[in-house]
């Protein structure tokens, strides 16, 4: 069993056994019912990517291609436009969060990255001093929240650090997430930010190091407990999936494409499970 599957099953079981029930929940299902959840707080995981530990479960198929395309929309295109997301990447699931028929998600995610020129600043800082301790990407922008409606960012902060091991430099990353639907989005979000870590490492010709993942509120929605039990029953495959970025070292961050990523040794348990999303 992979480390990701061990952590996944342990967290599902912990939520079922020890979780608290939500109150005054904001999300709704499509039929208008309030989407309550059972949750735990302060979930943490550590993966050593250099040793082949990747945060993706084999217990169900994870749509990694669309997840990486979404990441490019945020950090390369630096856009909040649903038209860009659909036309360029053929990704449609963000339509559920369109703001007031604007064909945007409001001043969120990519719009905040562009507003503060975050990627250029991070790359400049790392180029000038790889060992600086100020490499923080934060999407938590109160001014933007007041400017427009929109879903507040779930994965909202990632920090980077560089370590020397022998002759090699390794890039570590720490992702902080305020809220996460473990059955649907947990491994999508984790692998998105592993991909971002890999893109920055490639930009400088560094190796990928460790990935740290902290979720403040990790939950299962009240219409997902049958799926949770099914996942606990499933036996994971033996192979360890691995995400590979097939570009030369020092490829410019903005020249990398979604198709440059390849998920190897991934043969998840099927069939896929159906989830009604909370919006």
Curated annotation (Swiss-Prot):
Where in or outside the cell it occurs: the entry states:
Cytoplasm
The keyword Cytoplasm is annotated on this UniProt entry: yes
Q: Which Pfam families match?
A: Thymidylat_synt
Under which pathway is this protein filed?
Answer: Pyrimidine metabolism; dTTP biosynthesis
- Membrane-spanning parts: none
- What does the record give as the active site? 154 (nucleophile)
Identify the EC number(s). Answer: 2.1.1.45
Top-level EC class, please?
A: transferase
Q: Where does it sit, as one GO cellular component term?
A: cytosol
Alphabetical UniProt keywords? Cytoplasm, Methyltransferase, Nucleotide biosynthesis, Transferase
Which parts of the sequence bind (6R)-5,10-methylene-5,6,7,8-tetrahydrofolate? 181, 278
UniProt binding sites for dUMP: 133-134, 178-181, 189, 219-221
**How is this protein organized at the quaternary level?**
Homodimer.
Quote the HAMAP family the UniProt record gives.
Thymidy_synth_bact
Function, as annotated, reads: Catalyzes the reductive methylation of 2'-deoxyuridine-5'-monophosphate (dUMP) to 2'-deoxythymidine-5'-monophosphate (dTMP) while utilizing 5,10-methylenetetrahydrofolate (mTHF) as the methyl donor and reductant in the reaction, yielding dihydrofolate (DHF) as a by-product. This enzymatic reaction provides an intracellular de novo source of dTMP, an essential precursor for DNA biosynthesis.
Protein name as catalogued: Thymidylate synthase
The coding gene here is thyA
């Amino acid at each position: 069993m992979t480390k990701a599957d061990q952590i996944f099953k342990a967290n599902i079981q912990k939520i079922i056994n020890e979780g608290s029930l939500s109150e005054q929940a904001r999300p709704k299902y499509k039929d208008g019912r309030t989407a309550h959840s059972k949750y735990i707080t302060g979930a943490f995981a550590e993966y050593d990517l250099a040793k082949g530990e990747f945060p993706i479960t084999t217990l169900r198929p994870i749509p990694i291609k669309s997840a990486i395309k979404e990441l490019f929309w945020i950090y390369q295109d630096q856009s909040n436009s649903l038209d860009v997301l659909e036309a360029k990447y053929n990704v449609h699931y963000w339509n559920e969060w369109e703001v007031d028929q604007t064909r945007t998600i409001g001043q969120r995610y990519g719009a905040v990255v562009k507003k503060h020129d975050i990627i250029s600043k991070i790359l400049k800082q790392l180029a000038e001093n790889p060992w600086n301790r100020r490499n923080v990407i934060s999407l938590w922008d109160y001014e933007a929240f007041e400017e427009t409606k929109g879903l507040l960012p779930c994965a909202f902060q990632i920090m980077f650090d560089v370590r020397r091991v022998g002759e090699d430099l390794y890039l570590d990353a720490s992702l902080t997430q305020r809220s996460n639907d473990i059955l649907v989005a947990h491994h999508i979000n984790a692998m998105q930010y592993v991909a971002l870590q890999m893109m920055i490492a490639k930009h400088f010709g560094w190796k990928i190091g460790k990935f740290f993942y902290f979720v403040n509120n990790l939950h299962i929605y009240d219409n997902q407990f049958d799926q949770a039990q099914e996942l606990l029953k499933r036996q994971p495959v033996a192979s360890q999936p691995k995400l590979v970025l097939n570009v030369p070292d020092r490829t410019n961050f903005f020249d990398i494409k979604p198709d440059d990523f390849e998920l190897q040794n991934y043969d998840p348990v099927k069939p896929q499970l159906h989830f009604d999303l909370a919006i």
